[in-house]
Amino acid sequence: MTKKIKEIDWAKLLKVNRDVFFNLFSLNEEVAVSDEVKIKFYSLKYSGKGSDDLTFINHIYEAAVNYVFDEKDIKELIEDGYEPTDKALSYFGDIDPLTDGRYGELILYLFIEAVLQTPMIVHKISQTYNNNDQVKGSDGLFIGNINGQATLLLGESKMRNNFHVCVGDALESLKRYINNPESIDRELEVAKKHLSQDLKNLDENDLDLIYQSLRTKQIEFQEYNICYPAFLMYKEGKINNIISANKPEIESQVLEFLKSIKKRRSKYINESLPEIKNITLEFFMMPVVDVSSFREKCYTVFHNGKKYEREK
């Protein structure tokens, strides 16, 4: 009997501990707009000093090595006397954090593996296709089972200081793929050449099946549902007002505020969507006090305490 994509043991490829990841948030709630569109809201923990950005950033820092390298790469680096984490961090080069998309892509990876339980099949070091060290195509390619259905996921990430700009930019990127088979075909054509060595942990027959399924003209590709997950970090200005008021129970007040606006935010996203068919959308929404500040902190943690120096 011929094996199906959904019968592959995708869980054995997951690297993100979902329990540890979820524990970083004080808010984890979903707004189901429709069967095709799910919008999930997450909030970091808060105290009188503000949001606990550094705990979250240190977590993504520790996850970087499995994001950038597969197990074979890591093993070879250790054998050659290198520290894999140091090598992984070199991917996050000396680039202005206010414009660098790498941190958002890393967070997207964590959300997709933890929430949707679908592993990344092309590691980041292999996705760097051109001389500018920037990535063409989506911000991540994943495969797994969602609701018992084999699913191919092409992700996007945006971090903006304005909610409406963030949503607009994310949807503009997603439109490259939504109902556009040629874009998916180009993405998979490149991905086939850079598949994670971790896939070799599966059976050999599984590998052949996966490779065939990434050819859009083959019958195996038809087994997939197509999902477009998007991570959106945006500034929610009123959070800072709550913190500045310096009242007790700051975290509960922040949560009350975020819960009060999530339906309005979800409605805006839903009304902004293009017409979709035969696909699903997953939005991971992460409102913060200030996106620019969060980006700067990411750079500092990933560069051993160094702040990014801009030309004056």
Where are these regions (language model features)?
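A structured, charge-rich N-terminal accessory region that forms the first stable segment of a protein
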Residues: 2-83
